[in-house]
Every structure is written in structure tokens, then in C-alpha cells.
């Protein structure tokens, strides 16, 4: 049993190397591997999940589109958006997939509540919403009883690229961000708040901060 959690700050990164590192980490881990949260800000990219449909990518323009192995449909990542990847042994945590999704959604809801933002989850469409507007997207993959991929919380970003897609396959959905609701207006503030809430109800006895990707999981280009 490993009750250590590593919080890995990656800074700003292109999407594909981080995605491939997640896959490599998950493939190599065993029952003794510590869980990790990867905290990252991505260069502009559209990612199309396994349930995605081409018609939901309306006009990507100069932003690349990458087909990925997470659940869900198309979303946008870019500067000013908080992305956290959850590399967790959910069997060891005694979590089911739905429990993990609920925990992540509730983490964001509780974080926003600290700023008097009334957010909620929807059973029919994963993520976090304020009224009918979406502020946080969520997509996971489970392999060998372990999760990867994660959440994307809009903090202080250029929202225009969302108009080039039907976010999460939802036509007409409005995407919003925390800055415009008197919530966190910086990446670091949002990251600290979300991580605090996520870890508060889990039983990790040792939480370590690290920076950068471990080279064992970085594929040579």
C-alpha cells in the first residue's frame, strides 16, 4: 500500500507529450506506485474524446485537433485554463468510476462555493455548471484499475476558441470562466484551491510537491 500523493507541477506544455507520458505512467505503474496529480496549462488544442463526432468540430482554424483516448467528446485546452490529470489507483482508494467522477465534480463545486459561486453537476453530462453554462469539463480513462486524464477548469482565458466547436458535443452550450464570476483569476490560485479540496477527504499521509515530468515517462521525439 502506498499512501503518498505526488502533486506534479508541469507549467505550460504542449498536449501530446503530456498525454503520452500519462499513458506510459499508467502502463508502467504497479500496486506500489504512488498516485499523482499533474497540474498543467496547455498550448491551444482541441481534443476529441472517444465518444466525439466530427460534426461537433465546426471550424478549428489554426488550432490542432487531436483524437485521444479519454471518455467524452470534443473540448478545448488553452492558456489560462487549469488542467489537472488524476493518475490514481482507484482500486487502492476503493473507488468506483462513478465515485471518482463525483469526487472530482464535488471538488470543483466546493472550490467555487468558497467564492460564492453556485455550481452544480449534471447526471446526463459530466462536468460542472453554473445555471446552464459550463465552467469545467471532465473526461477520464480507466486502465488496469487506474485513472488518467482529468478536468479542465476555465479560469482566465481567451474563450473564443470554444465557439469553433460544440463543447462536449452540446450544441448551444455557453462556456464560462471563474474570472468573470469573481472567482479565481489566476492559474495558481485556482490550482491551489482545487487541490486543497480534492485532497482534504482522502487518506494520503504524505503529499509531495514536484515539478516537471519524470523522464521515465517522456518518449523521445
From Swiss-Prot:
One Gene Ontology CC term in the entry: cytoplasm
Marked site: Lowers pKa of active site Cys: 134
EC category: transferase
Pathway: Protein modification; protein lipoylation via endogenous pathway; protein N(6)-(lipoyl)lysine from octanoyl-[acyl-carrier-protein]: step 1/2
Entry GO MF terms: lipoyl(octanoyl) transferase activity
Location of the active site: 168 (acyl-thioester intermediate)
GO biological process: protein modification process
CDD domains: LipB (cd16444)
Catalyses which reaction(s): octanoyl-[ACP] + L-lysyl-[protein] = N(6)-octanoyl-L-lysyl-[protein] + holo-[ACP] + H(+)
Main location per the UniProt record: cytoplasm
Keywords tagged on the record: Acyltransferase, Cytoplasm, Transferase
Binding site for substrate: 70-77, 137-139, 150-152
Domain of life: Bacteria
Location in or out of the cell: Cytoplasm
Listed PROSITE patterns: BPL_LPL_CATALYTIC (PS51733), LIPB (PS01313)
Location of the BPL/LPL catalytic domain: 31-206
EC number(s) from the headed UniProt entry: 2.3.1.181
Cross-referenced Pfam families: LplA-B_cat
Note: In the reaction, the free carboxyl group of octanoic acid is attached via an amide linkage to the epsilon-amino group of a specific lysine residue of lipoyl domains of lipoate-dependent enzymes.
Purpose: Catalyzes the transfer of endogenously produced octanoic acid from octanoyl-acyl-carrier-protein onto the lipoyl domains of lipoate-dependent enzymes. Lipoyl-ACP can also act as a substrate although octanoyl-ACP is likely to be the physiological substrate.
Family: Belongs to the LipB family.
Identification of the protein by name: Octanoyltransferase
Provenance organism: Idiomarina loihiensis (strain ATCC BAA-735 / DSM 15497 / L2-TR)
Gene field: lipB
